[in-house]
Structures are given as C-alpha cells and as structure tokens.
Regions:
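Acidic beta-strand-to-loop metal/phosphate-binding motif
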Residues: 74
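Membrane-embedded transmembrane helical bundles of large multi-pass transporters/channels
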Residues: 1-37, 108, 123, 128, ...
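Structured non-transmembrane domains adjacent to transmembrane bundles in polytopic membrane proteins
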Residues: 45-71, 80-173, 391-580
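Disorder-to-helix initiation segments
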Residues: 41-42, 49, 246
Length: 588
C-alpha cells in the first residue's frame, strides 16, 4: 500500500511534529476525561414495557405533597444486637434515633417506619420472626442522581444498639457502579503488568515492550476521553468504560506488536530507520487498517439495537478502535523514528531470537505435516467448549450480580428471605382507553380484566389501583415466583393475551422489561450478524483478493465466538468455579 509507505516516510521526516500533535491529542483526551460525563443505565425504550412505563409517568397524577422532581428510594433493615423484638419500644427508639439525621437532611423526602403506619401495613415492614424491621427512605433525584450522594446519606445512619443494612434500587445501583469502577481499576492494575511481562517474552527487549505498552495506555486514555465526550451528546451506558479498556488495551498492543516487530525485522535485515518505518507501515500498517475496519464492522453490529445500551457500547468500542489505528500510524512510528535501533535496548539475556524462531517454526511445521488430524482435534475441542452455549439462558441483571459480601447484596438476601411478600414479584398492567377510564363501561371492562388475570396460574392477587390517569387504569399483580423465573415470564405473556373491551392492555415491571429486552435482542440479532458477516467478507475480499479466505475467517470467528459463549455459560450460568471466583451462578 504505497500511500502508507509514503506516510511512513513523512512521519520519519516530521517525527517531532507528529509526536507533538499526537501528545496534544492525548492531552485533549485527558481534558475530556477530567471533564467527565453522565454514564447511565440505558433502558430498552422501543418495547411494550418501555412504552407502558412512559405512559404511567405521563398520565398518573403526582401524589399530594410529592416533590416536582424525580425521586428514588431505598430500604434500611434494622436488627437489634441485644436480641430485642422489632416491636419492643427500646428497639423502635434506637431505630428512630439512627434515622433522625436522615430526616433532617434536605435530600430526604420521607422516611417510613413500622411505628408510623397502620398495623396492617406495619406487618409488612417487620420480618417473619419479628426480630428485624425496615425503614423505607425516599430521596430526591432518580436512581443515578441519588447514587451520587447515597454514600453520604448511608454514613449518617449509625447506632450502637441496632445493626443496619442498606439495600434497594439506589444502593444496589450504587454498588454496581462502584464494582464496575473497581473492576476497571483492577483490570488495569493486573493487565498492564501482565501485558508487559508477555511483551518482554515476545520482544526480549524492555524498550520495545515499554513503547508498545505506552501506545496501549494512550489509546485507553483516548478511548475514555472519547466516551465521555460522546456522553455529553447522547446516552452512554455505564458499561462503556469496561468495553473501552478491554478492547483498547488488547487492540492497541496487537497493532503495536505488528509494527514494532516488522520495524525491528527490517532493521535486522540492514534497512535504515526511514526505510524500516516505510516498509513496516506499508505491510503491517496495511493489515492494521483493514483489521481496524473489520473490528469496527463487528462493533457496528450493535447499532442494530436502537434504544438500548448496546448502541453506546458499539459507538464507544468503535471510537477506541479508530484511536488504536490512528495512534498505531502516527504516535508509534514517530516514537520508532526517534528511537531507531535503540528500540531494542535493555535486551533480556535469556530471550534469544533463534530459540523463539525454532519454537514457532517447529509448531508450524508439525501442524503442516498433519493438517487433517490437527484440524479435527481442534474443531472437536472447540465444539466441546461451545456445547454449553446450547443451554444459554438470557436475563437482565439483578442483585445477584454483586458479590455476596457487599452490604446491599446481604440486605437484599435478608429482605427476600425474611420479610413477608418480598420473595414475590410484581407485574404492572396498564389498561389504556381513548377516553375516561372511570366511565361505567370502562370500569366494568377493567374489573373483568382483573378477574381473568386473577384466575391465571401463579397469580397470588390482582388489584385495581385507586390511582388512574386521563386515559389509563392500572392493575397491580402479585406472583409468588421470582422476577426472572420462567413462570413469571409466562405470566407476563399470558396477561398480554388478555383483551380489555374498548381499550388496550400494556404490561410493564421488572419481568416485563426482562421479557421484552430478551425478545428485542433475539429479533434483531440475525440482522446484526448478517450485516457483520457480509461486510466483513467484503472488507477481507478487498484486502486479500480471495473469496475462500474471507469465508474461512468467518467460520473461524463463528467457532471462536461459540466457544467463548460456551465458556461463559459453563462458568457463569452453570456455576463452575463459583466458589473460586466468588459469584452467584445466574443467567447471562
């Protein structure tokens, strides 16, 4: 590719200028990173449950005295460390004393405790054995906004007489965000040293390893900065940073390996620095450009899921891949032009080039001598690794994604296991009419709908909410099944089959979002996969000038992706290594 060779010579002659511009770009990325952005949990909007949820927000009146701003809530579970009953006056006094600082905080809208509500409602706020009680706390701001100050509120609740656990939407979401950030930092702290050691083995030179790793670092900075810049103009998922870090480091090191290795080979063959850079970019650089295109194509498949968090993941991934290609063709060759032969400095004495060549040459020779047995054995192993993929079960994330030792997870387990009704799940049914839902005819239709829903399997009760909107009536349905169980999903589907005279039935709630999200993904996945395969074949055909090789590449990708998903199912869903890795087996 002659343009890349010419570009390599330009970079060599203007290496300090190219390096300066690259560093300015890194500085801009750092500035964008420091400016931050609002990363959030992006919902599925274009689904029945999403439309029903929006309809409720638009139509239902705000309760009297409720704030005009959005609110969210969490619960505090109290247990006496002196074995007092939750109805004991000393227990109640200690609980209220611990809650007084919350009541005085301007960010807290309300605090509901068992002693402040009617006896029938209070029973639901005490555990089955009567030893624990919970307080429901409503705060200003949505779940994401409240998560910013939740830690400060939690620190206000202290007591020497009662033990306290916080759980609910706000602390669970806060802990998920915190866990993601901690995992991101841990991944960086672990992956960078491991990558450096592997590069030392590959290059046998500390200088070449540091150059390659340095490109990975600046690519990650650029990717995170680009993601935060994207977040200032559109919704970006909180998981985007994980994608940027993992893909950015891997791709940047991969591309740098290509160029640095080819550059050193040309120097070893007697080329001067300028020619070595030109040849490296014309060969390895060409492969990098097409590799970046194919990786971006794969990530672009996520754009076929509009209205979901996957779009932002695809955009963030594409940004970091583009930055990887950009720095591999600018920042890296500028460094190589400055270092020249010194890129091989600080050589390790125990990593000689001949032995490494003999190792890989020997492996390749053995494979070529017995291609059919090696192929059959490899495919058989991959098929075995992929076999658990056939039992894949999809579900939305819930509290079980958190480590069991976290307070919000422990509180969730106590809440579900010890408080009446908390082990059940709810379904919200919206009956929408063209006019007043309180008219005589519509009242009768809603009551008929309630009766039919109450008779469905796995329904413990179905009630008509006293609150209605200009065009909607609301029913609340309780089921003894957990939100992500097959029975709860079947119930959502069964309710959606129930008609209401003169109107339309919409179902929302956690289980409905789960059902709709999975269905949404399954409907669009074939189109996304078809797009990725077709465009990848086209890109590889233009690169290789072959029809067979692109098809082989697609087949290898299918096998490797299937094996990867098989490993995920085997570990995460089936629970192998759960004790070692400290997680709860769950759907993916």
């Amino acid at each position: 590719m002659r343009p890349l060779a010419a570009w390599g010579r330009f970079v060599y002659r203007r290496r300090w200028l190219v390096l300066l511009v690259s560093l300015l770009a890194v500085g801009a990325s750092i500035a964008s990173l420091l400016a931050g952005g609002d990363l959030r949990d992006v919902e599925f909007r274009d689904t029945e449950s999403g439309r029903a949820s929006q309809l409720l927000r638009d139509e239902l009146p705000r309760p009297s005295g409720a704030p005009a701003v959005a609110t969210s809530s969490f619960v505090l579970i109290f247990a006496s460390n002196e074995a007092l009953d939750a109805s004991d006056p000393r227990f109640i006094a200690a609980m209220n004393a611990a809650l007084d600082p919350l009541r005085a905080d301007s960010r807290v809208v309300s605090v509901v405790t068992p002693d402040a509500v009617p006896p029938q409602q209070a029973a639901g706020l005490r555990s089955k054995d009567g030893k624990r009680a919970l307080a429901s706390v409503t705060v200003q701001g949505g779940t994401n906004a409240a998560g910013q100050f939740f830690a400060a509120l939690r620190a206000l609740v202290r007591s020497d007489s009662v033990d306290v656990l916080a759980t609910g939407n706000v602390p669970l979401n806060h802990d998920i965000d915190t866990a993601l950030e901690a995992d991101l930092q841990r991944a960086e702290l672990v992956s960078l040293p491991v990558a450096f050691l592997l590069l030392l083995i590959v290059f046998g030179s500390a200088a070449a390893s540091l150059v390659t790793l340095g490109v990975g670092v600046v690519v990650i900075l650029g990717g995170i900065g680009g993601t935060f810049a994207l977040a200032r103009s559109t919704d970006v998922s909180q998981y985007a940073l994980n994608i940027v870090t993992l893909i950015g480091l891997g791709v940047a090191i991969d591309y740098s390996l290509f160029i640095v290795s080819r550059f050193r080979e040309e120097l070893a063959h007697g080329a001067n620095v300028e020619d070595a850079i030109a040849i490296a970019l014309a060969t390895a650089g060409r492969a990098i450009v097409f590799s970046g295109i194919t990786v971006a194509i794969g990530l672009a498949g996520m754009l076929f899921y509009p209205g979901t968090f996957l779009v932002s993941l695809g955009l963030s991934g594409s940004i970091v891949v583009a930055i990887s290609v950009l720095y591999a063709l600018t920042f890296l060759p500028a460094l190589l032009a400055i270092l020249g032969p010194r890129v091989g400095a600080w050589r390790l004495p125990f990593t000689g080039r001949p032995s490494r060549r003999r190792l890989w040459h020997g492996i390749a020779t053995q494979v070529m001598r017995r291609p059919v047995p090696v192929l059959l054995a490899t495919v058989a192993f991959i098929a075995l690794a992929a076999s658990p993929f056939l039992g894949l079960r999809l579900a939305s994330a819930d509290a079980t994604v958190l480590p069991p030792a976290l307070e919000s997870r422990r509180g969730y387990d106590v809440l579900v296991g010890e408080f009446p009704g908390q082990d059940q799940s709810g379904v919200t049914v919206v009956a929408r009419f063209p006019d007043d839902p309180l008219s005589t005819a519509h009242r009768a239709a809603v009551e008929d709908l309630r009766t039919r829903i109450a008779a469905l399997p796995n329904v413990s009760r179905a009630d008509i909410s006293p609150t209605s909107g200009p065009h909607v009536a609301v029913l609340t349905v309780r089921t003894p099944r957990t939100a992500q169980s097959d029975d709860a999903r079947d119930l959502v589907r069964a309710i959606r089959q129930q008609p209401v005279a003169g109107g339309e039935v919409l179902v929302t709630g956690g289980t409905a979002f789960d059902v709709d999200g999975i269905q949404y993904l399954l409907e669009r996945t074939p189109v996304a996969i078809g797009f990725v395969m077709l465009t990848t074949v086209l890109a590889l055909f233009l690169l290789l000038g072959s029809v067979v090789l692109p098809l082989k590449a697609i087949l290898m990708n299918v096998l490797s992706v299937s094996a990867s998903f098989g490993a995920l199912v085997w570990i995460i869903q089936q629970g192998h290594l759960a004790n070692v890795l400290n997680f709860t087996p769950q759907s993916i």
